[in-house]
Swiss-Prot record:
The lineage of its organism: Bacteria, Bacillati, Bacillota, Bacilli, Lactobacillales. It comes from Enterococcus faecalis (strain ATCC 700802 / V583). Belongs to the V-ATPase D subunit family. This is V-type ATP synthase subunit D. It comes from the Bacteria. Pfam families: ATP-synt_D. Produces ATP from ADP in the presence of a proton gradient across the membrane. One of its GO terms (molecular function) is proton-transporting ATP synthase activity, rotational mechanism.
Length: 211
């Protein structure tokens, strides 16, 4: 590791020692942050996998019901039915922080009665498969939202982990070793100069005695 290009003076030595203290403290804080980010990221990945399995299974079940309903009901009736929803759904996105990482949190707001009757239609032209399909699709919405929240948070935490890792490595393998080597070099130079000065004074003293 190449040392820094500085003058070997006591003032420079003092300045570099302060820099080393700051860099060492910063490295510890960043390493702690990296470890905590990884812990939360792993927990979120596990949650994401569990949610995805649930959502995919429920979507598959809902689509199966819908396919069966579509096979026995009038196609025009189904198209008209799904053209206009029975209830307006509102989505609010707010920002929250996880270890100084801004992540979006989506809030899903709708009438709870929508889950019981997501679409307004009579039962004369319907069948049980259609009822089950719409009920399942409506019940999936909160889980889809939760899945979107978790996946976006995982994505942002992953980027922050990589950025923090680069900073930790830069301090650990470049900045701190450079400072340590430069400090060692200055200390050796100062000791060398001090020994040279002592030798010079001894010679002067010996010459004065001879005279």
């Amino acid at each position: 590791m190449a040392r820094l290009n500085v003058n070997p003076t006591r003032m420079e030595l003092s300045r570099l020692k302060k820099q080393l203290t700051t860099a060492t403290r910063g490295h510890k804080l960043l390493k702690d942050k990296q470890d905590e980010l990884m812990r939360r990221f792993i927990a979120l990945v596990k949650e994401n996998n569990e949610l995805r399995i649930q959502v995919e299974q429920e979507v598959t079940d809902a689509l199966s019901n819908f396919v069966l309903a579509n096979a026995t009901l009038n196609e025009a009736f189904i198209e008209e039915l799904v053209a206009i929803p029975a209830e307006k759904v509102e989505l609010e996105i707010i920002e929250q922080n996880i270890l100084s990482v801004p992540v979006p949190k989506m809030i899903f707001d709708y009438d709870e009665s929508v889950q019981e009757a997501p679409l307004d239609y009579g039962y004369v032209n319907s069948n049980s498969e259609l009822d089950q399909a719409f009920a399942k699709i409506s019940s999936i919405l909160p889980k889809l939202l939760a899945l979107a929240n978790v996946e976006k948070t995982c994505q942002l935490l992953s980027k922050e982990i990589e950025k923090t890792r680069r900073r930790v490595n830069a301090l650990e393998y470049m900045t701190i070793p450079q400072l340590e080597e430069t400090i060692y070099y200055i200390q050796m130079k100062l000791e060398e100069n001090e020994r040279g000065e002592i030798t010079r004074l001894i010679k002067i003293k010996s010459m004065n005695k001879e005279n």
